[in-house]
Amino acid sequence: QISSGRLKRSQWIERWGLDVARGMHAEVVEAFDVFRGLIRDHAIACEPQDGGHYYIAHRPWMMPTLTKEAALLRETFGYGARMLTRDELHATAVRDREAHGAMWEPDGTAVHAAKLAFGYLRVARELGAKVHVDSPVEGWTTKNGVHHLRTPGGTVRARAVAVATAGYAPRGLHPQLRDRIMPIMSNSIVTRPLTASELDACGFKVTSPLTD
């Protein structure tokens, strides 16, 4: 999904202005290109389902809102979002009986998350990075410009530290993490591969992301 948080592009403009919003949009578009390049150039077999993102309207009042947002994406950001009616959504993407329509965005990819993570691990090691598993950072102090990261196996010293923990780093680990990241519960259901008849019964016609 071509997004950078919960706010829509119109809300970006309201909060930070058009120039910043355009810069953020360009950054997200670039991130998709980088992602596609990484999995292509390094042969990361993460089963990408690259067919765009469907933002489904499950309430009638959402359709005018999404219609305005799609127009903004096209006219202000030069991005090819478009609207689908209920019938178009049913015919081309998913037979969702509660849907009133959807906004489709060209960028949206579903992946096998574990295969992607292990692919990144392989690539990092091939490029010379040292990866130490089972070594959580339990304490972080900074002295004279040097970071000291305490782990169960010893202390790592570094001039620079990149935090790549999503929203699940302890809030007290470092002052700059406090109130800047938010863990959000995500419930996932995994099934065996569905048969063609099961997919038809569920109404799925695409394997790309569907959200509301």
Task: Cite the ranges covered by each PLM segment.
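Short coil-to-beta-strand
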Residues: 1-10
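Extended non-membrane alpha-helical scaffolds
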Residues: 114, 127-130, 141, 164
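Hydrophobic side chains in beta-strands
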Residues: 2-3, 58, 105, 190-191
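A conserved short coil-to-beta-strand element within the FAD-binding core of flavoproteins
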Residues: 84-96, 129-147
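Flavin-dependent oxidoreductases
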Residues: 139-212
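Rossmann-like flavin
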Residues: 12-123
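Secondary-structure transition/capping motifs at alpha-helix termini
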Residues: 123-130, 197
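General beta-strand structural signal in soluble alpha/beta enzymes
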Residues: 48, 82-85, 131-133, 150-151, ...
